[in-house]
Amino acid sequence: MCWRLLCVTEKTATILGSLRQFHLKIATDIVFDESQQNLICYDISNGMCACGIIQNTDHVEADQNLLAQTIKKWRRKGLSEPAIQRRLHDKEKQLAHKRSQQVEDYAGILDKWLKERTSPVYLLWYWQDKNQQSIRFTLPNRIIRETHQIPENTWVRYHVDEIKKNIVEENK
């Protein structure tokens, strides 16, 4: 088990999601790095802070299930395989556009939120057990909350370098 830190880079200054969305399911549709493909995760177990990437694949499975159901429906209607393939191509394009639009809509909301704040890096901590089942959103008491009097379940604006320094000091 370890603390993990959801984080954005200074370069992108994009927030990875809201507490409510992450509470429902980790790595849902829109938690992206600058390539808009991945969730950026800093793992600070054992006092180390190593950058890792978690592929954002939840939406892929949902889209594949939807396409499979749609193909079954077309086959029941008696469509030929070439016709199904043509329609499938169009449907895949529609889904890709939908995902792209979600990113744009969400990015607009986050940009507005971000402009009201000044720190270049935004962090959210969560606890994850070894089976990746239990996810609880909080901030690590000893490292941040007690030092900065931050309430439960709030976003923390904090530089990653300072986080690393504090972690090293906490583990001496």
UniProtKB/Swiss-Prot annotation:
<protein>
    <recommendedName>
        <fullName>Uncharacterized protein PM0819</fullName>
    </recommendedName>
</protein>
